[in-house]
A protein has these predicted regions:
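Conserved N-proximal alpha/beta basic substrate-recognition cap immediately N-terminal to
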Residues: 1-90
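Flexible, glycine/proline-enriched loop segments at strand-loop-helix junctions
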Residues: 53-54, 101-107
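ATP-grasp fold ATP-binding core
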Residues: 85-103, 125-142
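Short catalytic/ligand-binding loop motif for oxyanion handling, primarily in non-cytosolic enzymes
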Residues: 29-30, 59-61, 99-103, 141-142, ...
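Phosphate-binding site of ATP-dependent enzymes
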Residues: 111-188
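Alpha-helix N-cap recognition
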Residues: 81, 109-112
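Pocket-edge structural micro-motifs
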Residues: 24, 52, 95, 134, ...
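Short, basic/glycine-rich phosphate-binding loops at helix/coil junctions
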Residues: 19-20, 96, 180-181
Length: 188
């Protein structure tokens, strides 16, 4: 596997025959995404295998809404700009773009949600980039949380690396908190 940035891809005059997987649309601006979509079309027009069309792939908020609507996700999400405050709690605020993780602790009331949203906007985060996410996770045992990840590549689901943490927000994990049995359980 070779990694190539969009900056590198869009500067190439020719590309080797390969399978190209377009990802991380929440990390690029609109114009780069549009150019990536044109590159995708050039690749497929020349019989190269390309996955995840930048022109039609959903970004975080629309994808989460779709998965929830299809019953695949049990939690809801709300666009802070368009949907207003959540109607279920607890929630947390995060950005739609980038991989910054949560921007707040768990918010349990509309008042806490409004106050946190106002504070993030005052700090310089754009309202149009903020979303509320309903928190539904439960610890796998007392004081231990696990985050799992999976990716679809074509028709194949590939599991990503899991992390374990003592905090509800298990983004990076904490070394030594999970046992070998926890990791073996994931392989079932």
């Amino acid at each position: 596997i070779d990694l190539m940035s969009y900056n590198q891809l869009l500067r190439k005059k020719s590309l080797p025959r390969a399978t190209y997987v377009f990802t991380d649309f929440d990390r690029i601006d609109f114009w780069t995404r549009e150019l990536a979509a044109k590159a995708y079309r050039c690749l497929t027009a020349n019989n190269a295998r390309a996955l995840n069309d930048p022109a039609s792939a959903r970004t975080r908020l629309p994808m989460l809404k779709k998965l929830q609507g299809e019953g695949l996700n049990s939690f809801s999400v709300w666009d802070a700009e368009m949907d207003g405050l959540p109607d279920r709690y607890p929630v947390f605020l995060r950005t739609r773009a980038a991989h910054r993780g949560t921007q707040t602790e768990l918010l349990t009331t509309p008042e806490e949600a409004r106050s946190a949203l106002d504070e993030l906007v005052r700090s310089g985060l754009c309202l149009s980039d903020l979303m509320f996410v309903e928190y539904c996770a439960e610890p796998i045992e007392d004081g231990l949380f696990r985050k799992l990840a999976a990716y679809c590549v074509g028709d194949e689901v590939i599991t990503g690396m899991s992390v374990h943490d003592e905090n509800w927000h298990a983004k990076y994990g904490k070394e030594g908190v999970a046992s070998e049995a926890h990791y073996l359980d994931e392989m079932q």
